[in-house]
Each structure stands twice: as structure tokens, then as C-alpha cells.
A protein has these predicted regions:
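N-terminal twin-arginine translocation
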Residues: 15-25, 33-50
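N-terminal secretory signal peptides
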Residues: 1-18
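Aromatic-lined carbohydrate-binding/catalytic grooves of carbohydrate-active enzymes
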Residues: 89-121, 147-156, 216-226, 292-295, ...
Length: 759
């Protein structure tokens, strides 16, 4: 028996666990038999939130407008009109061009490149003065990724070089800018002087560092010298270098990026802690290439005063596709999991990013904003084609976000410093993400497993967040009833030890496919690192189960399959399946059925269904339980959406979690958010987001839903008061002790209720 210490008490937010019999008896739909107290009083005054004076402005709810000015916008720039639009729509912060590539102020510094349409005006002076008079915050947008040829010729030694000493240029810009690197003079000494000048001469509240990342390999003298000192080797060439050499370069580059961000942050903070510094970080799902920017939220969170995740509804992919409607909430949950005390902001654009002169689908965008709010997030509208959204070629979305912005402005005190409540933690592994920089031979993808599992949790109204691998600790794990390892290939031994201790002491684990088959640096293991927990061992063989393969229900009375087993012997399977041998004490629920060839159909039969290799196993480990899926139900749910895959994951999560903080009669198309105040214990906000619509994207129209019921089980003493922040129909709140029931007669788009609980 492992010598693990006993766990401390679980977080009080978690309700009592549920045994197997109770799991089978309970329904996900709120039914009768609820003891209800008389209608509680509404809060006369909003419960006390965090006083503004105790937090810097960038830790309070943000509604950001970014106007990415074109050179020609300077011709008729009207600062008063920009301010009027912001006041009308509810934005409280403006991010506007200062310069770098093109300067929108009278720049006296070296490498200046003044907007030719500005003449003797100073656009930055005009807009900062107007915003300050109106009580609006302003951050200056700076961009040091590269310069035009005229500026490059003045200072060629400031910029990036290839192995032959020739300047590097950016392929995606027109004109092709001459690129800069993390160690070069342009991004460092020049950028620092530039930022110091702005903060010393303009009434700014901070700096927005645009396009901070750089994806290439630089051979400038500074990079060569720094890399040689760090590694004792020359800068590698991608065409001839080994994967290990390129990984070594990326380790150095990540460190260089980290130092660069720290240097820029220090430059800004030299003017006071009230000056904000931030930049955007791209997809949490994209593994990137072997050579990438070296910047993600793992290092950015330490340097940025608020967290920004790029979340456009239409993804920049080939072919173009829509992101999930819940993606804005996903990004917020991830950022809040990284740094819950910081504002988590989604960066989107009412006129999109792929076709910047035309609106993005308006209903999808409104849903996006409500999804972000429901998870405790805020939003940032990046306007790329005009002085402000109502002064562009396409103005159809100019006031699309007005209700969401006004909601934040009206309830800013209550919304401040909120983070999601979570019963389930999805383990986010940076090493696993990096593993997928090279496509997997088995076809599994980093994003698909997590997206597929998230869809199950969102549709099932199961509160969740993420566990970043570098924040794994006994204290963090104690927050959760269930930890999900959605094909987390790469786990180091210390991670395995902590997860094992978590389960041994009473925690529960749900894992899929190749979880723990690689160590922390991606090296393959012969067997699962978590084999003792899974209750099985990997044979080293992988079955191609993409077509005509199934799962045989071996234990028809098990809660995972009991709702189906009366009508079927088989369940769906697809993608790949790892062939494993179960341990003697493991309970095999389903087994792998090899391909039953469908042609000719007269020969498409099997004498019996194979029982040799398990696909679904339940295994006890100490005081805890583990469900292991040797196949890929999460990726299947993402790509195909077959109900068998979804149901197995949903039932498995509920079985392990027991009673959940949220029960509801709402359909899957109504997404539920539950957040709690980090600064004022006992304060919660329950949100409902309606995504009910037709079967295609973009969403044409959100269809109202009626007669919804939500029950909260927060394991606190009682409800003191509530305040309906937004609702379309009648909203009735009832309670008995710590249980709260909300009945809503109609939901059009978004409903939110604030609760003050007594512990």
C-alpha cells in the first residue's frame, strides 16, 4: 500500500458524494419533492463588493474598445466622436495606436515613421486628452515586430538576420516589414525609449504591446552570442538540425521571450503600478510549429496585468470554420485557472479578423459576449477598419454589444474579482501540447480530446475549469471531485505521484486513450505511467477502429451503460483503440469488437462479440476510483458527436463526481455559468446563456426557451439575499437552507442572478 497522507477536507463548495445506487436513481432533470421556503427578500442594495480604491483599475471589470487605425484615418480623425461612441455603448477603456510601424504622434525619436496623413496634428494627444476629460482609460498600442525599408536602412543592425547575415522580412505583411527579434536593439533599447517617451508625455494608463510574439530563428550577433553562452552551440538551422537541437533552441527562445516581456513590463511599471502592461496570447489549443514564438499564457501571466485570449468566432484556419459558441467561456475559464485574480478578457472583433471590412455574424457575437460574462470574463472589441465602429465601411455591428457593455458598467461592483466554481478539473498539459507540434501517427490531436470533453461538460451543465500542469499541487487537487485527463500523453513522474496520491486519498480520475504513455519530455513509455490507477497495462498494440468497429457491453448493469443495455449489446467506436490487458481487480465494462466487414453484407457477421481487450474500465485505487477509456470518446465527441461517446463521458463524470453544485431542467443549448467572488466570500453569480437556434452556423436567430428550473447546492449555511441582474421572464428564487432554486419563465439570451450566502 502506498504511503500517502490523508487528504484534508474538500472545499466547502462541493456537495456530498453520490453512491452508485443513488446515481442510477437520480435524474439530471430537476423534479418534484423539493422542500421550498417562502420567497426570499431581494437585496435592497447591492452587496458590498471590492472597493475600487483597493484594486488597480485593470483588476476591475473591463470593457475595451481597440481602434486599430489605418494611416488614412488621420485625415478626418474626430476624438470627440470616438469618446461619444464609447460613452453611448458602455466601453470604459480605449486602446489606440501610438506607433512603431506607423506613428500617430509627433515622434522625435530615432526610427520615427510619422503617419503621412497626419500632417502637423498629434492624433494620440487629441484622443488621450478627450478620453481623460471624459473619465475613460487609454492604453497606447505599440508594435515593434518590424519596420519599413526606409527605417531599416537607417539602423540595419537593430534587426533580425538569417544564417547568411541577410535581413529577415515578414512574409505576411504588405509591405514586407523588416523583422525584429527578442534580443535586438529595436525591440529592447529602442522600444524602451519609445515607451518611456509615451508615458512621460501623454496622459496614458498603460501600454498594449501588439504582436509581441515572433516565430522565426534569428542569427543576429546578439542572438548568436546569447545562444552560444546559454548552450555552448551555434544557432541551429531548421533544415539540418535534429529535433533535440530545435527543442534546445526553443527552450532558449522561450527564456529570451520571457526576459523581453519582463524588461518591457519593468519599463512601464517604472511610471507607477497603476500603469498597465499587456499583450495578446493566441489559441490555448494550437500546438504551434517546432519553432514558434515561445510565448503562451504560462509565461505571459507573470508579466501582463490582465489576461487576453484571442477568441474570434470565425477561426483563422484552412478551411475556415466557426469556433464553438462556448469557446469564449472556455478561454475565460482557462485564463482564470491560470491567474484567477486578474481580469480575463476575450479579444474579438465585431467586423472580424479574416474579412475586416465586413461584419462577423451578429448573433454569434452576442452569444460570445454572454458566454464570456457567464464564466467571469470581459471583452475587447478590436476594430480594424476605421476610427471607431460607427465610422467604418460596414457599421451593422457598431452597437451589437451595447447590452453586454452596459451590463458590465451597471454591475461592475458585483462582477469584480469573480472566478468559476468547479467540481471537475480538466488537466491542461503544456508538455502534451508541445508533443503535438508533430502530428501523431495515431491521428489523435491535442485540441480534439479537450474540446470533446468540454462539450460534454457544457451540455451537461457540469461546472469545470482547468488545472495547468505547473500548478499541480495537493491543495489545487483538493478543489475537485473529478480530475479529467483527456488524452494527456505527457506526464512526468512527479505529476504521476501527485495524481496517484490524490486518488489514493479519495479523489476520482477519468482518463482516456494515451494518457501517461509518454514522460514529461515526450519520451515514450512501454506502459502507462498510471497503469496502477487505470487497472490495465498497454500491450503495445493499437487497433484502427475508424470503421465498422464497436464496443461490447460486458457489464450491462453498470451505471455507465445501464440506460442503453436493455436495447443494445453494442456501442459505437471509432478512431483508434489501445489494446490493453486488465488487472485482476479491474471491472471491465465494455470490450473492443474488431472490424466487422460490411461487404458483402451477407458475410457481415460475427459468431460472438470479442471480450479480449477492454475499452472501458472502472478501477478502485485506495479510497478513490478511476474510469479509464482505452479508446477516444472525447475526440469522437468532438469530431463526430455520436451519442454513445457523449453519454459514456457524461455518465462517467457524474458517477465519479456525485452530487453536483448545479442541477437544471434546461436543455443542452442553455449553458450555465456559476462564479464566486474571490474577495467577498459567500457571493455567487449564476448565469444562463441561451444558444438555442437552428441547426447551422452562423446562428440566424436565438430562439427563446421557457419554464426553466435551476437548483444550486453550495454547501453553505443559507441564502441571505439575491439580486436579479438581468432576466427576460419572471425569475423566482426559493430556498431551503443551503439549497437554492431558481425558476425562470422565459430566457431569450442571458440571465444573471447574484446571491449572497452565509457560510
Amino acid at each position: 500500500m502506498p504511503n500517502f497522507s490523508n487528504p484534508e477536507d474538500r472545499e466547502s463548495l462541493l456537495p456530498p458524494p453520490m453512491n452508485r445506487r443513488r446515481f442510477l436513481q437520480c435524474s439530471a432533470v430537476v423534479g418534484g419533492g423539493v422542500i421550498v421556503s417562502p420567497l426570499l427578500r431581494r437585496a435592497g442594495d447591492a452587496p458590498a463588493g471590492v472597493p475600487d480604491s483597493l484594486l488597480p483599475w485593470y483588476r476591475l471589470p473591463l470593457c475595451i474598445l481597440q481602434t486599430v487605425l489605418r494611416e488614412t484615418d488621420a485625415r478626418n480623425y474626430d476624438a470627440a466622436a470616438v469618446v461619444s461612441y464609447m460613452k453611448k455603448t458602455g466601453y470604459n477603456t480605449l486602446i489606440v495606436n501610438a506607433g512603431g510601424i506607423v506613428d500617430f504622434f509627433q515622434n522625435p525619436l530615432p526610427a520615427a515613421n510619422l503617419d503621412p496623413f497626419m500632417n502637423d496634428r498629434d492624433i494620440l494627444r487629441e484622443i488621450t486628452t478627450a478620453c481623460r476629460a471624459a473619465g475613460l482609460r487609454v492604453m497606447a498600442r505599440v508594435d515593434f515586430r518590424g519596420v519599413e525599408e526606409r527605417v531599416f536602412r537607417q539602423h540595419p543592425d537593430w534587426f533580425s538576420m538569417d544564417a547568411a547575415g541577410k535581413p529577415l522580412q515578414l512574409d505576411y505583411t504588405r509591405p514586407r516589414l523588416y523583422a525584429s527579434c527578442y534580443t535586438g536593439y529595436y525591440r529592447n533599447e529602442h522600444a524602451e525609449e519609445f515607451v518611456r517617451y509615451l508615458l512621460a508625455h501623454y496622459p496614458l494608463d498603460g501600454i498594449w504591446h501588439n504582436s509581441i510574439g515572433w516565430d522565426g530563428i534569428c542569427h543576429c550577433p546578439r542572438c548568436r552570442e546569447s545562444f552560444l553562452q546559454a548552450t555552448g552551440a551555434p544557432v541551429p538551422e531548421p533544415e539540418s538540425a535534429s529535433p533535440a537541437a530545435l527543442d534546445g533552441y526553443m527552450a532558449w527562445k522561450t527564456s529570451a521571450a520571457d526576459k523581453h516581456m519582463a524588461r518591457m513590463q519593468a519599463t512601464v511599471k517604472a511610471f507607477g503600478d497603476d500603469k498597465a502592461y499587456a499583450a495578446e496570447v493566441f489559441s490555448m489549443y494550437n500546438p504551434g510549429g517546432r519553432i514558434n514564438s515561445g510565448i503562451d499564457l504560462y509565461n505571459a501571466r507573470d508579466h501582463f496585468d490582465f489576461m487576453v485570449g484571442v477568441a474570434f468566432p470565425i477561426e483563422s484556419t484552412e478551411p475556415t470554420r466557426f469556433a464553438e459558441l462556448s469557446y469564449a467561456g472556455t478561454v475565460v475559464r482557462f485564463m482564470k485557472s491560470m491567474a484567477p485574480e486578474k481580469e480575463a478578457v476575450i479579444l474579438y472583433g465585431e467586423n472580424g479578423t479574416l474579412h475586416r471590412y465586413i461584419m462577423d455574424p451578429p448573433v454569434d457575437l452576442r452569444i460570445y459576449l454572454w458566454e464570456a460574462l457567464a464564466a467571469g470574463g470581459r471583452f475587447w472589441n478590436a476594430n480594424f477598419a476605421g476610427a471607431y465602429p460607427d465610422a467604418t465601411s460596414d457599421r451593422r455591428n457598431a452597437f451589437n454589444n451595447i447590452e453586454a457593455c452596459r451590463f458590465v458598467r451597471q454591475h461592475a461592483t458585483l462582477l469584480a474579482q469573480h472566478a468559476p466554481v468547479a467540481t471537475v478539473g480538466i488537466y491542461y498539459s503544456r508538455p502534451t501540447r508541445l508533443f503535438y507540434r508533430s502530428p501523431s501517427a495515431e491521428g489523435d490531436r491535442f485540441d480534439a480530446a479537450m474540446k470533446g470533453f468540454e462539450n460534454v461538460l457544457v451540455e451537461g451543465h457540469i461546472p469545470y475549469d482547468f488545472i495547468p500542469n505547473d500548478q499541480l499541487s495537493p491543495e489545487r487537487l483538493r478543489r475537485y471531485r473529478v480530475v479529467v485527463l483527456a488524452n494527456v500523453r505527457c506526464l512526468a513522474q512527479p505529476e504521476i505521484d501527485q495524481l496517484s496520491r490524490f486518488v489514493w486519498n479519495g479523489g476520482n480520475l477519468l482518463a482516456t486513450f494515451a494518457t501517461s504513455l509518454n514522460d514529461g519530455d515526450g519520451t515514450a513509455r512501454a506502459d502507462f505511467g498510471l497503469a496502477d490507477l487505470f487497472g490495465c497495462s498497454f500491450t503495445g498494440k493499437i487497433a484502427d477502429t475508424r470503421q465498422d468497429c464497436y464496443q461490447y457491453i460486458l457489464q450491462p448493469k453498470h451505471p455507465l451503460v445501464a440506460p442503453d443495455s436493455g436495447a443494445t449489446e453494442l456501442l459505437f467506436n471509432a478512431d483508434r483503440t489501445l489494446l490493453c490487458r486488465p488487472a485482476p481487480d479491474a471491472e471491465v465494462i465494455c470490450t473492443h469488437v474488431p472490424e466487422v466487414h460490411n461487404q458483402p453484407p451477407e458475410k457481415a457477421w460475427a459468431e460472438s462479440w470479442s471480450r479480449e481487450f477492454p475499452t472501458v474500465i472502472e478501477h478502485g485505487y485506495g479510497k478513490g476510483r478511476v474510469l479509464y477509456f482505452a479508446n477516444q470518446p472525447d475526440q469522437i465527441n468532438c469530431d463526430i458527436g455520436h451519442p454513445d461517446a457523449r453519454n459514456l463521458l457524461s455518465r462517467g463524470t457524474r458517477l465519479l463526481a456525485g452530487s453536483l453544485p448545479v442541477e437544471t431542467s434546461a436543455p443542452e443549448s442553455v449553458h450555465i455559468g456559476l462564479t464566486r467572488s474571490l474577495a467577498s466570500p459567500g457571493q455567487y453569480i449564476l448565469s444562463l446563456v441561451n444558444t438555442t437556434s437552428g441547426p447551422v452556423r452562423p446562428v440566424r436567430r436565438c430562439l427563446p426557451v421557457f419554464d426553466l428550473e435551476v437548483k444550486l447546492h453550495l454547501a453553505v449555511r443559507e441564502l441571505v439575499s439575491h439580486q436579479v441582474l438581468r432576466a427576460q421572464g419572471k425569475c423566482r428564487i426559493e430556498a431551503h437552507g443551503s439549497d437554492v432554486r431558481m425558476r425562470l419563465s422565459r430566457l431569450d439570451d442571458f440571465c444573471a442572478v447574484h446571491f449572497q450566502m452565509r457560510s
